[in-house]
Amino acid sequence: MRGPAVLLTVALATLLAPGAGAPVQSQGSQNKLLLVSFDGFRWNYDQDVDTPNLDAMARDGVKARYMTPAFVTMTSPCHFTLVTGKYIENHGVVHNMYYNTTSKVKLPYHATLGIQRWWDNGSVPIWITAQRQGLRAGSFFYPGGNVTYQGVAVTRSRKEGIAHNYKNETEWRANIDTVMAWFTEEDLDLVTLYFGEPDSTGHRYGPESPERREMVRQVDRTVGYLRESIARNHLTDRLNLIITSDHGMTTVDKRAGDLVEFHKFPNFTFRDIEFELLDYGPNGMLLPKEGRLEKVYDALKDAHPKLHVYKKEAFPEAFHYANNPRVTPLLMYSDLGYVIHGRINVQFNNGEHGFDNKDMDMKTIFRAVGPSFRAGLEVEPFESVHVYELMCRLLGIVPEANDGHLATLLPMLHTESALPPDGRPTLLPKGRSALPPSSRPLLVMGLLGTVILLSEVA
């Protein structure tokens, strides 16, 4: 019986060696990937503005008629769906604001970007998955990209300041230059790049305003500069580019006699509420005081024809939103164009999002071009939850558990890009293991035990 014991000892040594568990390929043989998000770019923003660079990208690559974001259609939740492939109830970033119903702490959007425990709550985004499989990743202003996940930070990251000017076109180009250097000088494989427009302009002036149209022209010029930069850095044949967004935008209805105002509802009082998250577009959450859930629900369920109020367990499953411990016992949203006012009226935006993701004004864009994508292809609409699986395929990495389906977007790719290399498992760079670090000690212990038993038998 010494022969099997020797073989198992060799297997144990192999498992402990660097790169065990994965076929080997040389560094640099996989195409790189750049995911760009222009916040709040509604699906039809290119239809009332001349956008020659976005049009050229569609001719050279793939265009979706539109993309359906996750619900709730907010910036951070929808961006995290893109990089995890999970619906919001499953990845847990349920709001732009960090909140705690026990301490009553609520933090605004920019502060929440740096709250590690808000983001790192069980889901592993694509940056970390890529790095664990031997790649190098970067995040430039992308929501969630500057905190650690299970103790791992993104290779390179930048976070904007609280008073950041999202409109500065000169800075946009400088940011692109930095990202190109990350690819060429630091050999990053994946970068996510975020721009805060046309969302800010849409909020301030409204989606039908001339200011929004001018901002879309700026976005288009930036797309042109980006593609020129890719060519100038000799990346055209080895970098796949995806341009998308988190959600759309709609015009806010400000008619004084038709507002959704909690402080004017006759049978409702904030004295029954332990915690509230209101005055954030069309969405709201309430934690009633103990024993007052039914009273609050009865007061609100028919309080306004444009307001939809649900107990958590009755919230429509199609939204894939409410089944998360961070969601309060009562939650609500309003119809398209209506925002929810709480104790006083503090919302004055002309444009807003956060509405039902089935509303066309919440739909957004998807464009892709590069060596893996077909040219001149327009595809039918799809959900943003599928983009993660596509990106993992483009990078040649094994995805985490997710809610997307790779088959949904495979028709975008050339046949050779749609299939695993030679039908074999995903290849990893030299010196890295496909086995998660947490699983290797268990395998080692199992093999050691087998070796000892066989030695005793012998």
UniProtKB/Swiss-Prot annotation:
It is an enzyme of class 3 (hydrolase). Glycans are attached at residues 100, 121, 146, 168, 267. One of its GO terms (biological process) is fatty acid homeostasis. PANTHER family: ECTONUCLEOTIDE PYROPHOSPHATASE/PHOSPHODIESTERASE, ECTONUCLEOTIDE PYROPHOSPHATASE_PHOSPHODIESTERASE FAMILY MEMBER 7. Zn(2+) 1 binds at residues 39, 75, 246-247. GO terms for cellular component: Golgi apparatus; membrane; microvillus; plasma membrane. Substrate binds at residue 96. Zn(2+) 2 binds at residues 199, 203, 353. The chain crosses the membrane at residues 434-454. Changing residue 100 to Q: Strongly reduces N-glycosylation and enzyme activity. Pfam families: Phosphodiest. Residues 22-433 are extracellular. Inhibited in a dose dependent manner by ATP, imidazole, orthovanadate and zinc ion. Not inhibited by ADP, AMP and EDTA. Detected in the colon (at protein level). Expressed in the duodenum, jejunum and liver and at low levels in the ileum. Expression was very low in the esophagus, stomach and colon. Disulfide bonds: none annotated. Residues 72-78 are annotated as: Required for enzyme activity. Changing residue 109 to L: Decreased enzyme activity with sphingomyelin and para-nitrophenylphosphorylcholine. It catalyses: a sphingomyelin + H2O = phosphocholine + an N-acylsphing-4-enine + H(+); 1-hexadecanoyl-sn-glycero-3-phosphocholine + H2O = 1-hexadecanoyl-sn-glycerol + phosphocholine + H(+); a 1-O-alkyl-2-acetyl-sn-glycero-3-phosphocholine + H2O = a 1-O-alkyl-2-acetyl-sn-glycerol + phosphocholine + H(+); 1-O-octadecyl-2-acetyl-sn-glycero-3-phosphocholine + H2O = 1-O-octadecyl-2-acetyl-sn-glycerol + phosphocholine + H(+). Decreased levels of alkaline sphingomyelin phosphodiesterase may be associated with colon cancer. It comes from Homo sapiens (Human). Changing residue 267 to Q: Strongly reduces N-glycosylation and enzyme activity. Its EC number is 3.1.4.12. This is Ectonucleotide pyrophosphatase/phosphodiesterase family member 7.
